[in-house]
UniProtKB/Swiss-Prot annotation:
Site entry: Transition state stabilizer: 325
Protein name in the entry: Ribulose bisphosphate carboxylase large chain
Subcellular locations according to the entry: Plastid, Chloroplast
Pfam families assigned: RuBisCO_large, RuBisCO_large_N
Lineage: superkingdom: Eukaryota
Keyword Magnesium in annotation: yes
GO BP terms: photorespiration; reductive pentose-phosphate cycle
One GO molecular-function entry: magnesium ion binding
Source organism: Catesbaea spinosa
Name of the top EC class for this enzyme: lyase
Chief subcellular location: plastid
Family matches, as NCBIfam families: PRK04208.1
Length: 468
């Protein structure tokens, strides 16, 4: 007799196991499943578990050569999504042995691989992952983390201030360096290469690195504060990326930058290891994230990309503003900000957190608020993000009517006023505008900024919202 029975079996016979008790070593995933009509919920959840682990569409004789019970993913719970017709959250447990140690690339290749093109599903979204502590311990994580960064910069008790140099493309290296100098001289802690500044004909990377290093050393000498410029090391190959990071280290600058989604997780982890070994901080930009995370029914939520970044490595990552021009609902944003910074985060569905996550002392990542923010937003940003954040004003610095340095002064005065008011027990959410007005009496730069941006609003509802 034949040792196995050929043919197509329902996935739920093997992969839907509601009685399964999850293990501390399992990777747990919460998928939002939108099926084709007529497919029962158990079959959908089981199909996701199968296609992202050991299953294929038909029975194969080589199944008998391994222990599927040991290696298969299991759909262990399904719940309907409130307010949505025929949409479910499927919870899947993956055994740890399915994944290579220390590889975000391998983890994502399994969990968000071919299954997202599966015909039986109209749409599929990965809402959250629970990374087991045993797997976290195979990663280095952020090169330095929040406390080490503060110690390196000697800056405590307040958020850090940044600015993206604009126009993002087209400046020569010397003019670019001049813009950096003006911002840092005015009181900012950091300036930033835009994510698409790499090494183009109008400004090659080596020239930019040299002029920016000159600018930050000059600003440091004048202000007595440590300054940084995020030198974007992102390149077409890993070798070229590391070459740029090496040159940044030789210049003695404190921080480099990487576009982690367009650059890829393998490149990002490589750079993070180099940065820890060589004392460089690593700023991460999330260009391309909205392609993956903006649609509510398909793709992957940013909280998963944020967890992946903390594993792969980065000291800063862009994380939305709540109040500016880019997508981000308050409760959702605060949920993944906690996932970036804190050591232990409780399950809290009201903030989109599906699983309790223990980071077992993996260093934290500083969230960066950037995109359409200006001095009037300062009280809200200080209240929402607290001290461990970088508040990044591009147009909100460079758009000042008197120039870059006065724009930087306006932001620094507004920030110091908000921190002082908070420390005195004032409510920034209620008294924010009053605090800024009071400060502007003593700072003509801030008064001018207040006048320019007093009418600016980005009143659009977020696309990706919490379920009711």
């Amino acid at each position: 007799s034949v040792g196995f029975k050929a043919g197509v079996k329902d996935y739920k016979l093997n992969y839907y196991t509601p009685q399964y008790q999850t293990k501390d070593t399992d990777i747990l995933a919460a998928f939002r499943v939108t099926p084709q009509p007529g497919v029962p919920p158990e079959e959908r959840g089981a199909a996701v578990a199968a296609e992202s682990s050991t299953g294929t569409w038909t029975t194969v004789w080589t199944d008998g050569l391994t222990s599927l019970d040991r290696y298969k993913g299991r759909c262990y719970h399904i719940e309907p999504v409130v307010g949505e017709e025929d949409q479910y959250i499927a919870y899947v447990a993956y055994p740890l042995d399915l994944f290579e140690e220390g590889s975000v690339t391998n983890m994502f290749t399994s969990i968000v691989g071919n299954v997202f093109g599966f015909k039986a599903l109209r749409a599929l979204r990965l809402e959250d992952l629970r990374i087991p502590t045993s797997y976290i311990k195979t990663f280095q994580g952020p090169p330095h983390g929040i406390q080490v960064e503060r110690d390196k910069l000697n800056k405590y008790g307040r958020p850090l201030l940044g600015c993206t140099i604009k126009p993002k493309l087209g400046l020569s290296a010397k003019n670019y360096g001049r813009a950096v100098y003006e911002c840092l001289r005015g009181g900012l802690d950091f300036t930033k290469d835009d994510e698409n500044v790499n090494s183009q004909p109008f400004m090659r990377w080596r020239d930019r690195f040299l002029f920016c290093a000159e600018a930050l050393y000059k600003a440091q000498a004048e202000t007595g504060e440590i300054k940084g410029h995020y030198l974007n090391a992102t390149a077409g190959t890993c070798e070229e990326m590391i070459k740029r990071a090496v040159f940044a280290r030789e210049l003695g600058v404190p921080i480099v930058m990487h576009d982690y989604l367009t650059g890829g997780f393998t490149a990002n982890t490589t750079l993070a290891h180099y940065c820890r070994d060589n004392g460089l901080l690593l700023h991460i930009h999330r260009a391309m994230h909205a392609v993956i995370d903006r649609q509510k029914n398909h793709g992957m939520h940013f909280r998963v990309l944020a967890k992946a970044l903390r594993l792969s490595g980065g000291d800063h990552v862009h994380a939305g503003t709540v109040v500016g021009k880019l997508e981000g609902e308050r409760d959702i944003t605060l949920g993944f900000v906690d996932l970036l910074r804190d050591d232990f985060i409780e399950k809290d569905r009201s903030r989109g957190i599906y699983f309790t996550q223990d980071w077992v002392s993996l260093p934290g990542v500083i969230p960066v608020a950037s995109g359409g923010i200006h001095v009037w937003h300062m009280p809200a940003l200080t209240e929402i993000f607290g001290d461990d954040a970088v508040l990044q004003f591009g147009g909100g610095t460079l758009g000042h009517p008197w120039g870059n340095a006065p724009g930087a002064v306006a932001n620094r005065v507004a920030l110091e006023a908000c921190v002082k008011a908070r420390n005195e027990g004032r409510d920034l959410a209620v008294e924010g505008n009053e605090i800024i007005r009071e400060a502007s009496k003593w700072s003509p730069e801030l008064a001018a900024a207040c006048e320019v941006w007093k009418e600016i609003r980005f009143n659009f509802a977020a696309v990706d919202t919490l379920d009711p």
